[in-house]
From Swiss-Prot:
<feature type="transmembrane region" description="Helical">
    <location>
        <begin position="342"/>
        <end position="358"/>
    </location>
</feature>
<feature type="transmembrane region" description="Helical">
    <location>
        <begin position="373"/>
        <end position="389"/>
    </location>
</feature>
<feature type="transmembrane region" description="Helical">
    <location>
        <begin position="96"/>
        <end position="112"/>
    </location>
</feature>
<protein>
    <recommendedName>
        <fullName>Putative O-antigen transporter</fullName>
    </recommendedName>
</protein>
<comment type="pathway">
    <text>Bacterial outer membrane biogenesis; LPS O-antigen biosynthesis.</text>
</comment>
<keyword id="KW-0812">Transmembrane</keyword>
<keyword id="KW-0997">Cell inner membrane</keyword>
<dbReference type="InterPro" id="IPR050833">
    <property type="entry name" value="Poly_Biosynth_Transport"/>
</dbReference>
<feature type="transmembrane region" description="Helical">
    <location>
        <begin position="192"/>
        <end position="208"/>
    </location>
</feature>
<keyword id="KW-1133">Transmembrane helix</keyword>
<dbReference type="GO" id="GO:0005886">
    <property type="term" value="C:plasma membrane"/>
</dbReference>
<dbReference type="GO" id="GO:0009243">
    <property type="term" value="P:O antigen biosynthetic process"/>
</dbReference>
<feature type="transmembrane region" description="Helical">
    <location>
        <begin position="236"/>
        <end position="252"/>
    </location>
</feature>
<feature type="transmembrane region" description="Helical">
    <location>
        <begin position="23"/>
        <end position="39"/>
    </location>
</feature>
<feature type="transmembrane region" description="Helical">
    <location>
        <begin position="309"/>
        <end position="325"/>
    </location>
</feature>
<comment type="function">
    <text>May be involved in the translocation process of the nascent O-polysaccharide molecules and/or its ligation to lipid A core units.</text>
</comment>
<keyword id="KW-0813">Transport</keyword>
């Protein structure tokens, strides 16, 4: 009698490795807080926190090439076609993209940094521009290196991407620990380089490795045009999404005190760990959804999505309750040198916000896997305007809670209903 082994779905294997990777990454970010505050002090750590917000902005430096390439790979796999030429074309284009953005950052760093870090002019003095430019360079290496991970996820070996990503953050943390225990004096710039540069360098090394393997592959003009045509839509969506999701950093840099900035960023990093778990599932599901869409298996796709949204929302609620009940113990370990005073109202708003994110991010992923971005181009700019105004207005009276309320309002009035409605219309058309 044969014993049939239980076959674990590939997306769950990838998601499982992603969970572990995200836990390690978030663990590194949380563990680093205590050391960084000790080395930099609360005010300089507030500056460090604002600069790390640039990491999300710099995720756009690939011009959407990585996401467009990921979908091409998934489609070629579903049709049993080679996709090597697409990868090589994408890597050529990404090199041009990073050169362009480096020049852009160099030109505009002075103007942007003067406004973004205006509350800390006395602390930074004449170092603002160079600190901002250096941060952009470091985070751009991470943004362009993410193409490597998108290739691996599309090839359904995302566990390799998760392993490399986790390893890179661990190397950064080891560097920070070395500096701390050796008693080496550091500033904000060196702290950023030590902690984050390994993250970009490891992924860039993998890109070089893949390019060497594809050196003999022939590319044509049609490959470049195809990548550019599709990536342009993803780039615009990414840029608009960043404006929406990073408006809070722009607001808190102008509206909140250094102490509140630290409390806000620390709290969001903790909840970022919670949400990382769900985004890991979405990341693993993306190529699966793309293949199901090509095969027109809508019933299976809809069931998968419904289950994920339900479980994701319950998970967020449970984690919010747990973090609130044990907040004193949690924050005494993570940031023992700060006076933590985030209200129950803020915790409730954070829970609501991330439940909304579960819903919206799922449908955004579905539409992107279908290469349908038009509705996002319409709704996301509107969301950015609503979010910016609401956060600016409510933060003046409610502080941290006002920023969170503004975020919730921006989602509720736009993408919360617009994305699922658009998906249903597209799915019914087949």
């Amino acid at each position: 009698m044969k014993v049939q082994l239980l076959k674990i779905p590939s997306h769950l294997i990838v998601a499982g490795s992603s969970w572990l990777s995200k836990i390690i990454i978030a663990g590194v970010q949380l563990a680093s807080i205590s050391y960084l505050i000790s080395m930099l002090g609360e005010e300089k750590y507030a500056i460090f926190s604002l600069l790390t917000g640039l990491l999300v902005w710099c995720s756009a430096v690939d011009f959407g090439i990585g996401t467009g390439l990921q979908n091409y790979i998934s489609e070629c796999r579903a049709k049993n076609k080679s996709y090597d030429a697409y990868i090589k074309s994408a890597l050529h284009l990404s090199f041009i993209a990073i050169i362009f953005f480096i020049a852009l950052f160099y030109i505009f760093s002075g103007v942007i940094s003067a406004k973004y870090l205006s509350s800390f002019h006395e602390v930074l003095q004449d170092k603002t521009r160079m600190l901002f430019f250096t941060s952009c360079l470091v985070f751009s290496s991470i943004g362009i290196g993410a193409i490597a991970y998108k290739i691996l996820f599309a090839e359904l070996v995302g566990w390799k991407a998760n392993l490399l990503n986790a390893l890179s953050y661990m190397i950064g943390m080891l560097g920070l620990l070395y500096i701390y225990y050796r008693g080496i004096s550091v500033d904000i710039k060196l702290s950023l380089i030590v902690l984050y540069l390994p993250v970009g360098m490891i992924s860039l090394c993998y890109i070089v490795y893949r390019y060497i393997k594809l050196y003999h592959v022939k590319t044509t003009k049609s490959h470049y045009i195809a990548i550019l045509r599709r990536s342009s839509g993803f780039f615009l969506f990414t840029l608009l999404s960043i404006v929406v999701l990073q408006t809070d950093y722009m607001v808190i840099s102008q509206r909140l005190t250094p102490a509140d900035i630290v409390q806000y960023t620390v709290t969001m990093k903790i909840f970022g760990l919670v949400f990382f778990i769900y985004t890991a599932i979405l990341q693993a599901l993306w190529p699966i959804c793309a293949e199901l869409r090509v095969k027109q298996q809508w019933k299976k796709l809809n069931k998968m999505i419904g289950v994920n949204i339900l479980l994701g929302s319950l998970y967020v609620v449970g984690c919010t309750i747990f973090i609130y009940l044990f907040k004193e113990q949690i924050f005494s370990v993570i940031a023992k040198d700060i006076n933590y005073q985030v209200s129950i109202l803020s915790f409730m708003l954070i829970g609501i916000y991330f439940c909304i994110r579960v819903w919206c991010d799922t449908y955004a992923m579905l539409l992107q896997s279908m290469n349908y971005l038009k509705i996002l181009w319409i709704l996301v700019p509107l969301q950015a305007i609503i979010g910016g105004i609401a956060q600016w207005y409510f933060s003046s009276t409610l502080g941290i809670s006002g920023v969170l309320l503004g975020l919730i309002i921006s989602f509720a009035l736009t993408v919360f209903w617009g994305l699922p409605l658009t998906y249903l219309i597209k799915a019914n058309k087949g």
